[in-house]
From Swiss-Prot:
It comes from Leptospira biflexa serovar Patoc (strain Patoc 1 / ATCC 23582 / Paris). Heme b binds at H272. The lineage of its organism: Bacteria, Pseudomonadati, Spirochaetota, Spirochaetia, Leptospirales. GO terms for molecular function: catalase activity; heme binding; metal ion binding. The active site is at H110 (proton acceptor). It holds the Pfam family peroxidase. This is Catalase-peroxidase. There is a cross-link at Y231-M257 (Tryptophyl-tyrosyl-methioninium (Tyr-Met) (with W-109)).
């Protein structure tokens, strides 16, 4: 019936005639558009993050293997073709100085620069710059043209290189074509096919900044200073031309994007060695709508400029105008020489933006015009550039770079590599022949496997020893979960490999029950040490996961279901020298609904944090549901809390959580003593049966989650529940095993 209805609608469209005429008027059907449930009930828990990026949206199909395609690519030939594009100016968007290199550097930088360490979101992976909102952010103005310039390359190579990889590679090639030696390039970034659901800030208009509280304290997880900017306002905080105030914004923003002071100075000084800013006239008078709001006839282009030619020397982008150096398409130290060699005074660009030029007209004929060889200009600086001169810490670094060009070159090369690869995860995800020879600490390296892996008989023997160790099922499950569930699919960090749960800072996180964790790890280390005395060896990272698996098999057995939890050895144990404590501190789960933990200082509600954590773990709605219910039955709450343990048989892998949650003989009410806690009362006697939190009750309250919970609460679901739990559990344990995927 549904297909027949679609066919009828299609026929009606055919007989009603061409739709072009209607498109020239007001958009038809606006009053008939569906209004989402979120509109009617804005407080309703939004499950959309768990439904994004499904395989159904990928036109390349479920079986497409990007890594295999990329490995067949002739990367050197591709790079030469990119260089040809770079030096072939197009009439529809002429190249500054006859070279698109600086333009492509900005494209690559802005593709990667959205990354933020707090939640790992943003970054170059997925090629999200192609989609809204990033495609239409003010800070990305005219980058639609940069990608369109690359379309002939993408068209030729098709599925062999993703847009995500192509944008970063093009940035590298741009640097190399202008005389700079890059630190390397890794492919492996797959393309997304829809816009990512990311919280970019509370603002409702571009360039607003309601993201601050108190004394300009930027709220987590945000990093940029204003809605629609990648980093900071180049004119200074909210347009205030104060270099020292700008330095504070720079340090905060770049720090939240994983860069220290030295990397920050290197990136700004290195990046502004190339190219120019564009602001030949007032954008409010001459620049049209961004791509998302432009007309169909623009075919994805935005920011149409009606000032004179509309491009070339009349281009309007940021509103700032000019170049920093006399050789904007060559790698030099001129940026630093100019920064410290001139005294800078405030002026305004032709568009009215605040910028800086040398005092008393110095350097007036230093910089060639980007399009008219008969014209010369003075160099310019942004307020944010002068921050490198006036901030004490930045100044020391910038002067050192000026005096030591080779050190500056290496620092920029490494910072650029970090910027463009920060969200790629471990080295096992890197593809290509141009990789750095030595691992970098921000890549969270782990040792290579240097021992023979355990086989089936040894695995069974180890499981027996674990179950006889005196450690309980909940203890083993909690420890394995704590080790693996630190993983973030957003930037592929964390996970069980490396056994960093035994190292600082992870061993001290409150959610991990440090006292209990220490005892469990000590016992497992004893088992490991004894086993490793002869024959094959096992890492602690592997043993932690195996211990959790053994506990689940035992718990399922007690429930009357025989099951074998998959186990793939090959993890190794990282050292403290391979672990950046500060870098790992951002992985700390401030809330973990699967362990019924909700720490202080969270900006989202417990149920929102449930969805966020499930999204980080790449879980579907059914996987999230069965995992939480199973963890409750296994008595795996943090701190041994009994909230949500809706079973009289804790430690048994049963579907009791769902059965008792949906039991109509229980009436739920808010606790009068504890905020956020609920009590389940016997409807007849009023006696208290259970206590639970919002992340427990949401599976009975939310209509879509209840529908899934009903499946697992059914009488015929006992075996399905166990098998689905095991499948989801194994998925979490294997999230960081890119070496076997």
């Amino acid at each position: 019936m549904r297909n027949f209805r679609r066919f009828t609608i299609a026929l009606l469209v055919l007989f009603l005639g061409p739709i072009g005429a209607a498109d020239t008027k007001e958009t038809p059907g606006m009053d008939r558009q569906n209004t989402s449930n979120q509109f009617w009930w804005p407080e309703r828990l939004d499950l959309a993050p768990l439904r994004q990026h499904g395989s159904e949206s990928n036109p390349l199909g479920r079986q497409f293997h990007y890594a295999k395609e990329f490995k067949e690519l002739d990367i050197q030939t591709l790079k030469e073709e990119i260089k040809t594009v770079m030096k072939t100016s197009q009439d529809w968007w002429p190249a500054d100085y006859g070279h698109y290199g600086p333009f492509f550097i900005r494209m690559a930088w802005h593709s990667a620069g959205t990354y933020r360490i707090s939640d790992g979101r943003g970054g170059a992976g997925g090629g999200q710059q192609r989609f809204e909102p990033l495609n239409s952010w003010p800070d990305n103005a005219n980058l639609d043209k940069a990608r369109r310039l690359l379309w002939p390359i993408k068209k030729k190579y098709g599925k062999k290189i993703s847009w995500a990889d192509l944008m970063v590679l093009t940035g590298n090639v741009a640097l190399e074509s202008m005389g700079f030696k890059t630190y390397g390039f890794a492919g492996g970034r797959t393309d997304d096919w829809e816009a990512d659901l990311v919280y970019w800030g509370p603002e409702k208009k571009f360039l607003e900044d309601q993201r601050y509280k108190g004394n300009r304290e930027l709220k987590n997880p945000l990093a940029a200073v204003q809605m629609g900017l990648i980093y900071v306002n180049p004119e200074g905080p909210n347009g205030n031309p104060d270099p020292l105030a700008a330095a504070k914004d720079i340090r905060e923003t770049f720090g939240r994007m994983a860069m220290n002071d030295e990397e920050t100075v290197a990136l700004i000084a290195g990046g502004h060695t190339f190219g120019k800013a564009h602001g030949k006239s007032d954008p409010s008078k001459h620049v049209g709508k961004e791509p998302a709001a432009a007309g169909l006839e623009e075919q994805g282009f935005g920011w149409k400029n009606n000032y004179k030619k509309g491009n070339a020397e009349d281009t309007i982008t940021s509103g700032l105008e000019g170049a920093w150096t006399a050789n904007p398409t060559k790698w030099t130290t001129q940026y630093l020489n100019n920064l410290f060699g001139f005294e800078w005074v405030q002026t305004k660009s032709p568009a009215g933006a605040i910028q800086w030029v040398p005092k008393d007209g110095a350097g007036a004929n230093m910089v060639p015009d980007a399009h008219d060889k008969s014209l010369r200009h003075a160099p310019i600086m942004f307020t944010t550039d002068l921050a490198l001169k006036f901030d004490p810490s930045y100044k020391v670094i910038a002067k050192r770079f000026q005096e030591n060009p080779k050190e500056f070159e290496l620092a920029f090369a490494k910072a650029w590599f970090k910027l463009t690869h920060r969200d790629m995860g471990p080295l096992t995800r890197y593809i290509g022949k141009d990789l750095p020879k030595e691992p970098l600490i921000w890549q969270d390296p782990v040792p290579a496997v240097n021992h023979k892996l355990v086989g089936p008989k040894e695995i069974e023997s180890l499981k027996g020893k674990i179950l006889k160790s005196g450690l309980s099922v909940p203890q083993l499950v909690r420890t394995a979960w704590a080790s693996a569930a630190s993983f973030r699919s957003t930037d592929m960090r964390g996970g069980a490999n490396g056994a960093r749960i035994r190292l600082s800072p992870q061993k001290n996180w409150p959610v991990n029950d440090p006292d209990e964790l220490s005892k469990v790890l000590k016992k497992l280390e004893q088992i490991q040490e004894e086993f490793n005395k002869s024959g094959n060896k096992i890492s602690l990272a592997d043993l932690i996961v195996l211990a959790g698996n053994a506990a689940i098999e035992e718990a399922a057995k007690k429930a009357g279901v025989k099951v074998t939890v998959p186990f793939t050895p090959g993890r190794t144990d990282a050292t403290i020298e391979q672990t950046d404590e500060y870098s790992f501190s951002v992985l700390e789960p401030k809330a973990d609904a699967f362990r019924n933990y909700y720490g202080p200082g969270n900006l989202m509600s417990p149920t929102e944090m449930l969805v966020d954590r499930a999204n980080m773990l790449s879980l579907s709605i059914p996987e999230m549901t069965v995992l939480l219910g199973g963890m409750r039955s296994l008595d795996a709450n943090a701190g041994k809390s009994k909230h949500g343990i809706l079973t009289t048989k804790p430690g048994v892998l049963s579907n009791d959580f769902f059965v008792n949650l949906l039991d109509m003989s229980t009436k739920w009410q808010k606790s009068e003593q504890t905020e956020g806690l609920y009590e389940g009362l016997d409807r007849k006697t009023g006696s208290k049966r259970w206590t639970a939190t919002s992340v427990d009750l949401i599976f009975g309250s939310h209509s879509e989650l209840r529908a899934v919970a009903e499946v697992y609460a059914s009488d015929d679901a006992k075996e399905k529940f166990v098998k689905d739990f095991v499948s989801a559990w194994n998925k979490v344990m294997m999230l960081d095993r890119f070496d076997v995927k």
